[in-house]
Amino acid sequence: LVRKSCERLYEGRMGVWNGSLKAELRPAEKVLAKKTRSFTAAPLDTLLGAKVCVDDFNNWFYSKNMECPWTVGMTKFYKGWDEFLRKFPDGWVYCDADGSQFDSSLTPYLLNAVLSIRLWAMEDWDIGEQMLKNLYGEITYTPILTPDGTIVKKFKGNNSGQPSTVVDNTLMVLITMYYALRKAGYDTKTQEDMCVFYINGDDLCIAIHPDHEHVLDSFSRSFAELGLKYDFTQRHRNKQNLWFMSHRGILIDDIYIPKLEPERIVAILEWDKSKLPEHRLEAITAAMIESWGYGDLTHQIRRFYQWVLEQAPFNELAKQGRAPYVSEVGLRRLYTSERGSMDELEAYIDKYFERERGDSPELLVYHESRSTDDYQLVCSNNTHVFHQSKNEAVDTGLNEKFKEKEKQKEKEKEKQKEKEKDDASDGNDVSTSTKTGERDRDVNVGTSGTFTVPRIKSFTDKMILPRIKGKSVLNLNHLLQYNPQQIDISNTRATQSQFEKWYEGVRNDYGLNDNEMQVMLNGLMVWCIENGTSPDISGVWVMMDGETQVDYPIKPLIEHATPSFRQIMAHFSNAAEAYIAKRNATERYMPRYGIKRNLTDISLARYAFDFYEVNSKTPDRAREAHMQMKAAALRNTSRRMFGMDGSVSNKEENTERHTVEDVNRDMHSLLGMRN
């Protein structure tokens, strides 16, 4: 495919590029000014050949960021922005030049200059030279398919979807900047003493000596001579006010940290265009990362993230460990390259295991913030969320050293408890408060009494209850304590006595003992996961013994199943779900029941078997998927209550008499017709 693309490019056969509007929210001012941005995507047959032409030069270009006057290929993290801003001398005048309608204003003259630079840097290869010339001819004069089906051919401007857009734009601004400096009378040597600038695409950032600030006034005119519209009036004396690529650097601990405008960060949270809940969580995490440096904003985003993780379906993702999170120490490491201290890590580990010693909740999510409280605990629906202060923000990585230390602490506390018990048993006359090491509080004679907080009763006398002769037929005291398990009273599974009778019947028919039944039922459960529990199945079912198939008759399974085989197998629902999850932990596994229903989400595989028991803990997506699969399996199916009755005869006596002159055995004559 790459060779065919190169061949097309060499022969000058242009592809049709696809023009479309950018999927973005634009300010009202931009919309009213009709500055809607478009995107021009390269066709595949041009794209592959184009990458062959430009990739080597582009990779070299990226490697020279900050060494040369461009930042293409730099990272804003790990003190990258600090290195960038410190390239500008202190006390100079800083200008963030603003270019408007950049791509559409580029002239063929500038594009041809980029072509000349690439040809100069290219190895001696005649075929590649022709491909490169044809590529930039196609970029300049591009056939574009518009959304209404019209194909137009442009004659100027760069294409936003070509594989070297940013590098080419940077080169064209670089050429124009050198042109403006030369025209202002500065050669290479004098330029280095009075001007430092960096470019990234159409973004231009300039630092100029105060004695030469007037030169900026002539730059707009010089840029316009080459077709570019730039404004050089935004000038600053403080580096922190300098905007470049929509970022400005703010000083935190003497390091310049790149920051977007707070409104842009909030917009990441406001505009939800994600199709999957995982993508929504990733967007919130991205906003959390971008907000670091704006203390209050980061705190509010963490609070919002805490709330989101309590809502469906995000709470299910968190329980499965699929909710991304970045700690305060992780963010500090990302921006400043500083590792978290051992004290911070140990504080986190201590707090973690302190919470873990109790009953393990369904979900533990640790959140860090800049709030004054060290830890704020919020509990909702068995969900524990911890807010951790910045001072104790630590990384979540656990190492063996901390685990060993925690085990030692546990052993010491156990010994201490045993010692206290022994001391308490020696003195039986010691009061309870003394045994526990706590003193009774003195009574304050000046108190005026206590107030009792009223409790609302679950059942009141005002409830409308079923009654006979004025007396309620319900025992409310018993009802308050009666909380049976749903599965124990569900009519979708056989009762325990029915299951035991089925077990005994199958065991006797198969001639197995209890230990053999355990192994056999493992195989039966896996077979039913794959093949279902329809009452119409017959023949044999199969279990594997290594590479050998072992057959078992199905008849005993169905005969002893009351009320139905599916209701018997419902007892295996939880084990089957765990088995599928276990298989998916080591390989991609979807039961045949899910494959037949074309279930594409592998995370729902654990619910893709027909004897799964839906309960109140089943996630909404899983419940919907299971119901849809069941509806698809049962569609247009019907069962006959009666088959053909073989004992009923439809015989009758035929008293018809025929002679040899009759036409046939059903007709005496042809009613007068003759041959």
Swiss-Prot record:
<keyword id="KW-0696">RNA-directed RNA polymerase</keyword>
<keyword id="KW-0946">Virion</keyword>
<dbReference type="GO" id="GO:0000166">
    <property type="term" value="F:nucleotide binding"/>
</dbReference>
<dbReference type="InterPro" id="IPR007094">
    <property type="entry name" value="RNA-dir_pol_PSvirus"/>
</dbReference>
<dbReference type="Pfam" id="PF00680">
    <property type="entry name" value="RdRP_1"/>
</dbReference>
<dbReference type="InterPro" id="IPR043502">
    <property type="entry name" value="DNA/RNA_pol_sf"/>
</dbReference>
<dbReference type="GO" id="GO:0019028">
    <property type="term" value="C:viral capsid"/>
</dbReference>
<dbReference type="GO" id="GO:0039694">
    <property type="term" value="P:viral RNA genome replication"/>
</dbReference>
<feature type="domain" description="RdRp catalytic">
    <location>
        <begin position="92"/>
        <end position="216"/>
    </location>
</feature>
<keyword id="KW-0167">Capsid protein</keyword>
<dbReference type="InterPro" id="IPR001205">
    <property type="entry name" value="RNA-dir_pol_C"/>
</dbReference>
<dbReference type="GO" id="GO:0006351">
    <property type="term" value="P:DNA-templated transcription"/>
</dbReference>
<dbReference type="InterPro" id="IPR043128">
    <property type="entry name" value="Rev_trsase/Diguanyl_cyclase"/>
</dbReference>
<feature type="region of interest" description="Disordered">
    <location>
        <begin position="390"/>
        <end position="447"/>
    </location>
</feature>
<feature type="site" description="Cleavage; by NIa-pro">
    <location>
        <begin position="388"/>
        <end position="389"/>
    </location>
</feature>
<dbReference type="Pfam" id="PF00767">
    <property type="entry name" value="Poty_coat"/>
</dbReference>
<protein>
    <recommendedName>
        <fullName>Genome polyprotein</fullName>
        <ecNumber>2.7.7.48</ecNumber>
    </recommendedName>
</protein>
<feature type="compositionally biased region" description="Basic and acidic residues">
    <location>
        <begin position="390"/>
        <end position="424"/>
    </location>
</feature>
<dbReference type="InterPro" id="IPR001592">
    <property type="entry name" value="Poty_coat"/>
</dbReference>
<keyword id="KW-0693">Viral RNA replication</keyword>
<dbReference type="GO" id="GO:0003723">
    <property type="term" value="F:RNA binding"/>
</dbReference>
<keyword id="KW-0808">Transferase</keyword>
<dbReference type="GO" id="GO:0003968">
    <property type="term" value="F:RNA-directed RNA polymerase activity"/>
</dbReference>
<comment type="similarity">
    <text>Belongs to the potyviridae genome polyprotein family.</text>
</comment>
<keyword id="KW-0548">Nucleotidyltransferase</keyword>
<keyword id="KW-0547">Nucleotide-binding</keyword>
